[in-house]
């Protein structure tokens, strides 16, 4: 496989994780861009990066850049996605990949028009344990899926300027942590949910700080999701089938799953991969998609999850400034 040259736009916590993963893989993190020049310089020195850019467009116009990783706040993603894709760059973009379905559709069309790969950096889809579980489910050992339960809760001190609660930064639980829970649901469900019921509590800033969501698809498979920015919960996902259930803790980057079989109650513990290598798996899968010219990094799931989040926010009447009057 060719040695691809990467650029990272944004050098916060997750940007540092990507750089460390690139080092572990012996990859080529060739350039960095950040709105604060001094921060970008420090980042480049720390990781031995050749090029530092102050302007995103300079990254996009650099012919030596093959893949751009975007880890800026998610309300800014679309403004970087479109010019990067139009410049012929493959893009791996942090979750949530866009604010709404309309933005994602625009980005997807742009990627298709320019023959490049666009993917969301959703760790869950690339962890080896999920691929192993998919094989188990396909074998029929668990029977048909019936129900999924999801929890994800963090405790954040309320601060109107913090990105979690700031409407101008597209804050709220759904786009930040709910995207993981919905991605889990979509991975295990046989088709997209088409019925949605939900309740939400909004923060004083107008973003969602706590929510309960119920989903069902045409096969009768159901899921419940509990999300909160004010109550710590275990990151627990449970998928129940006719013949047993799968339980996964720390599901965004899981490497272990426990399967309990209904008939006799015995349990199997599956282990695959490593939580510490989550971003390495993303990088490898992205480079593989680029090498084979395919949009095969779970893009269909990304689209379905974005459609769900857009519909849920429409139920809540929650919009962001960029949407000019309505979630799209």
Describe the predicted segments one by one.
Residues 31, 51, 67, 147:
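Short, Asp-centered acidic motifs that coordinate Mg2+ and/or phosphate
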Residues 51-63:
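Short acidic low-complexity segments
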Residues 1, 67-69, 218, 285-328:
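C-terminal helix-rich "cap/oligomerization" subdomain common to oxidoreductases
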Residues 67-74, 78-125:
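Beta-strand-loop-alpha-helix segment that lines the small-molecule cofactor/substrate pocket
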Residues 1-47:
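N-terminal Rossmann-like dinucleotide-binding module
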Residues 183-254, 273, 283-294, 327-328:
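Contiguous beta-strand/loop segments that form the cofactor/metal-binding neighborhood of enzyme cores
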Residues 125-196, 204:
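Predominantly a Rossmann-like dinucleotide-binding segment in NAD(P)-dependent oxidoreductases
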